[in-house]
Amino acid sequence: MNIQQGKVWKFGENIDTDLIIAARYLNTSDPQVLASHVMEDARPDFLQHFTKGDFIVAGENFGCGSSREHAPVALKTAGVSAVIAKSFARIFYRNSFNTGLPILEVKETDEIREGDTLEVDMAQGTIKNLTRNQTYAFKPIPPFMMELLESGGLIEHAKAKIAQGVL
């Protein structure tokens, strides 16, 4: 999980959970079904061009709106390596770690363009824009939160701890 490389899919400010996964799909909790509809209201052709391992880059307040775990689950299951944004809605932030979706706060998202290739080093806290030869730093993810990501989310982390006899 430490170093990931992929293409950028750029979105704007205030991308709410209804744009990530529309409310009409909330009658299912099947991650594959959710993933098959991710971002379709924001960009109908998104999944036709998206490749697993790519990144979503956005502005302020990504994941605002209603509190639904479906949104980070849909992104993670679709294969989004990480969401990189200037800021995140707090409940989306927490739900993302709980479901194992990496999210990174970076102030320079305006410098990153659609189609750029990024290399993200989770351990070093750096993002290299290989297209533009620029490097951006992000606040390192706290150790416990990294454990959640590496385990695949809070439930998988708890299962592993129980299996180890720690919980």
From Swiss-Prot:
Record's keyword terms, sorted: Amino-acid biosynthesis, Branched-chain amino acid biosynthesis, Leucine biosynthesis, Lyase
GO biological process: L-leucine biosynthetic process
Pfam families for this protein: Aconitase_C
Enzyme class, first EC level, given as a word: lyase
Quaternary assembly: Heterodimer of LeuC and LeuD.
UniProt function note: Catalyzes the isomerization between 2-isopropylmalate and 3-isopropylmalate, via the formation of 2-isopropylmaleate.
Name used for this protein in its record: 3-isopropylmalate dehydratase small subunit
Organism whose genome encodes this protein: Wolinella succinogenes (strain ATCC 29543 / DSM 1740 / CCUG 13145 / JCM 31913 / LMG 7466 / NCTC 11488 / FDC 602W) (Vibrio succinogenes)
